Every structure is written in C-alpha cells, then in structure tokens.
C-alpha cells in the first residue's frame, strides 16, 4: 500500500510543476498588461487636460496603439 501512495505522489509532482510554471507565465503577462493599462489611464487623463491639437493627436495615437496591443495579447 505504501508503494501505491508513493506512485500517486510521483505522478502528481510533474502536474504541480507544470501548473506552477503556467501560473508564473500568466502572472508575468498580467504584470505587463497592468503596466499598459496604467499607462493607458494616464494618457487618457493627460488627453483631458491637453488643449493643443498636435499633442492631442499624438496622445490619441498612443492610446490606440496601446489598446491594439492589449487586444492582441488577450
């Protein structure tokens, strides 16, 4: 019976390692997305407070690029 328990534990370990790695990968991805989302929010606030047309166009362009990047990553 102890052999059976030992075998079960050995079978579960690779799955646990895989899950842990998978979780770490998604966590890194989420950190990158969070940074992009924060930057996006900052740009939107900046856009509200900017009145110069050229600057507004540049900010809108950056916002669009970030939104596209976020959509591609999902």
Swiss-Prot record:
Protein family according to the UniProt entry: To U.parvum UU416.
Highest taxon of the lineage: Bacteria
Protein name in UniProt: Uncharacterized protein MPN_377
């Amino acid at each position: 019976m102890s052999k059976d328990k030992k075998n079960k534990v050995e079978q579960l370990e690779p799955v646990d390692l895989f899950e842990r790695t998978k979780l770490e990968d998604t966590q890194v991805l989420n950190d990158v997305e969070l940074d992009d989302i924060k930057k996006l929010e900052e740009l939107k606030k900046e856009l509200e407070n900017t009145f110069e047309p050229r600057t507004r166009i540049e900010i809108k362009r950056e916002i669009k690029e970030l939104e596209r990047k976020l959509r591609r990553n999902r």
